């Protein structure tokens, strides 16, 4: 074997190994193969395409079939629903519309109260929790209140242009949904 071939063989092996690893890692970034999808107390009934959600940059799980949403300017946000159990889910859903509008405005979208709008956002709270007093004292950040939110974003014709699923924490349920919707708005603005 020539000197050049002996030097090239290890380099080619490393490149092939890295390519194989990157492919394997990308496969693990699908929602349905994640630990998040295995939570039995978190319904998966709101979004039509859970199988297409991939790991997002700001929000946990995203699907943008058309890519980024920069061409859209006006947004109408509907009242949020909740299919999570308990008063916390209902409470979090009541804050959803207000916070979604606030964070979309900060991302440069014009929020309108009535249609027609370029985009319509529909939201759902699939889970919300408030730990008990002892858990808050002993559990640290892991025992903070949290909210699970899902968004469907449609264009004027009613076609889905984005789906997002996010779990977030905060000092209160009120704070947790705001934190989550801030991440969702960033993902909407960036399209990833």
Residues of each region from the PLM?
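Bacterial N-terminal signal peptides
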Residues: 12-20
């Amino acid at each position: 074997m020539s000197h050049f071939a002996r030097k090239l063989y290890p380099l080619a092996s490393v490149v092939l190994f890295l390519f194989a690893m990157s492919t394997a890692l990308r496969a693990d970034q699908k929602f349905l193969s994640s630990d998040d999808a295995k939570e039995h107390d978190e319904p998966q009934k709101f979004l039509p395409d859970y199988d297409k959600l991939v790991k997002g940059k700001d929000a946990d799980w995203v699907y943008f079939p058309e890519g980024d949403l920069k061409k859209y300017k006006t947004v109408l946000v509907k009242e949020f629903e909740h299919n999570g159990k308990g008063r916390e889910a209902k409470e979090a859903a009541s804050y959803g519309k207000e916070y979604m509008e606030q964070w979309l405005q900060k991302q440069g979208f014009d929020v309108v109260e009535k249609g027609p709008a370029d985009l319509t956002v529909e939201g759902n709270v699939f889970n919300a929790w408030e730990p008990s007093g002892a858990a808050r004292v002993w559990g640290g950040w892991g025992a903070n209140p949290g909210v699970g939110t899902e968004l469907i974003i449609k264009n004027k014709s009613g076609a889905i242009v984005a789906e997002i699923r996010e779990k977030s924490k905060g000092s209160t349920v009120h704070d947790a949904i705001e934190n989550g919707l801030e991440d969702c708005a960033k993902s909407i603005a960036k399209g990833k």
